[in-house]
Amino acid sequence: MERIGGQVKDQEELAKQVLSWITCAKRPLTTSELQHALAVEVGESALDEENLPQIEDIVSVCAGLVAVDKESNIIRLVHYTTKEYFERTQNHWFPNAETDITAICVTYLSFHAFESGFCQTDAEFEERLRLNQLYDYIAHNWGNHAREALTLCQQVIGFLESELKIEAASQALLAIKRYSGHSKYSQEL
């Protein structure tokens, strides 16, 4: 962490965001999910793709603490003891991580892309997933992050007041993969 702290401010901040997301994530994140998480600007109504950090930059600023699995495209801490360390010392290194992640999650779910509510077809839903890489993770886990947050952020209230955005998030919870390991989804219950 000394090496991370010795970087220029923007790189140090990026490294801490990466490490907090990887430490606090409720399941392993893909590189594209993490890129989207890092690119969200709280309070904005759309993702600015110019904010997507390059994977090489993400790995570099973390000073050897993270690695990308080439087969699964999962970004993770290099060793399980590193994860255990950050989980144990989370309040020291990332004291507001769950609050910050909650704000990012709810901002993402409040994007204009979800204002249409429930997708009418499987193809439309799959396209929504493809275009919004973090959507599935956030729809399933934003509530868990909110429950662990130190404070309730204003974005949660705004999100909960939008029936169509709630519908869109709920759809991701209800949709199931047709076949294990297959990218096709079905909305049939």
Specify the residue positions occupied by each region the protein language model found:
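Leucine/isoleucine-rich amphipathic helices and adjacent mixed helix/strand linkers
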Residues: 1-189
